[in-house]
Amino acid sequence: MADYQHQQQHQRPADAFKGMFPEKGQAQVQGPSASKVIAVVTLLPLGGFLLLLAGLTFAGTLIGLALSTPLFVLCSPVLVPAAIVIGLAVTGFLTSGAFGITGISSLSWILKYLRGTSVPEQMEHAKRRAQDTAGHLGQKARETGQTVTGKGQEAGKTLEGGRGEEKKT
């Protein structure tokens, strides 16, 4: 019994790839789709180029480090404490910002929880406010249009009245 369980736990390495290739009795599977081929053809050279750039950057970094190491060793009594102070200051600022963002988001969540509003309710409220505002703006536009029309008619009557007097003279 123990031998049977022990044999079941072992897998042959070839078993992991069985699902990738069709067996002799199975129907032949179509090749990759056109979009997959285009993705590979496009991304393979791009990935190779980026890998080349990464290698060049790494080599340049190593060369620069090899050339500047003697200067760092000579100036280390000054540079090491300065680097530690700058590193601690940057860490402090980043930590402060992270704690601030965490605190604000926590307070915001607590406020929403205490109000008992959920996102769908907030969306519905915003939708209603937008509709009310649109209706209010439409009403104002109608009123303004009527006012402009009335003033235009008044101006037209005034001009007609003035022209009539000029013709008489």
Swiss-Prot record:
Membrane-protein topology = Multi-pass membrane protein
Motif Proline-knot covers: 70-81
rRNA processing among the record's keywords? no
- Looking at the UniProt entry, the stretches that span the membrane are 38-58, 70-90
Q: Which InterPro entries match?
A: Oleosin (IPR000136)
Where expressed (tissue)?
Answer: Expressed in seeds (at protein level).
GO CC terms in record: membrane; monolayer-surrounded lipid storage body
Q: Which UniProt keywords apply?
A: Allergen, Lipid droplet, Membrane, Transmembrane, Transmembrane helix
The principal localisation class reads other
Biological process terms from the Gene Ontology for this record are: lipid storage; response to freezing; seed oilbody biogenesis
Taxonomically, the superkingdom here is Eukaryota
One protein family per Pfam: Oleosin
- Location of the protein in the cell: Lipid droplet; Membrane
Return the annotated region ranges for Disordered.
122-169
Q: Where is the composition biased (Basic and acidic residues)?
A: 122-131, 160-169
**Domain notes, please?**
The proline-knot motif may be involved in the targeting to oil bodies.
The record's PANTHER family line, in alphabetical order, gives: OLEOSIN (PTHR33203), OLEOSIN 20.3 KDA (PTHR33203:SF44)
User: What does this gene product do?
Assistant: May have a structural role to stabilize the lipid body during desiccation of the seed by preventing coalescence of the oil. Probably interacts with both lipid and phospholipid moieties of lipid bodies. May also provide recognition signals for specific lipase anchorage in lipolysis during seedling growth.
Q: Family per UniProt?
A: Belongs to the oleosin family.
User: What is the name listed in the Swiss-Prot or TrEMBL entry for this protein?
Assistant: Oleosin Cor a 15
| Source species of the chain | Corylus avellana (European hazel)
